[in-house]
């Protein structure tokens, strides 16, 4: 009987520990800046968004697209670049990681994921003017 109680107590402690540790082990949806920096480059352009219809498809860098990730497509910035996207109308901003190519429509500078568009307030407009701040280029290997 004592042995069973010990095993039950150990199992309960293990389950509680897993619920405490598991959230800490979750992978981030975007890389964070390695250090606080001023933008390398700043410019203004139009942003559009792409979302759930693209979920599960491969991006240009080979990752699987997730509309809830903090990612974006840009025509020529290196994959892994970190860009702060600022809605010029509202001042809302989000840090994104470039993992895809596009947009392919003239006059558009960046395509952001659905999550980013939602946070910036771009969903209903579809296309909005944004300020792009290149914060970090990927490390060369």
How would you name each of these model-derived features?
Residues 2-141:
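Secreted/periplasmic proteins
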């Amino acid at each position: 009987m004592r042995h069973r109680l010990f095993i039950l107590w150990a199992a309960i402690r293990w389950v509680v520990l897993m619920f405490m540790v598991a959230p800490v082990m979750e992978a981030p949806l975007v890389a964070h800046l390695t250090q606080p920096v001023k933008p390398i480059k700043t410019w203004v352009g139009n942003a559009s968004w792409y979302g759930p219809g693209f979920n599960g498809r491969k991006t240009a860098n080979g990752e699987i697209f997730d509309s809830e990730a903090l990612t974006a497509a840009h025509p020529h910035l290196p994959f892994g670049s970190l860009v702060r996207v600022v809605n010029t109308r509202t001042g809302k901003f989000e840090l994104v990681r470039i993992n895809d190519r596009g947009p392919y429509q003239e006059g558009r500078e960046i395509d952001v994921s659905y999550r980013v568009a939602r946070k910036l307030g771009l969903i209903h407009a579809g296309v909005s003017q944004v300020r792009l701040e290149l914060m970090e280029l990927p490390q060369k290997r």
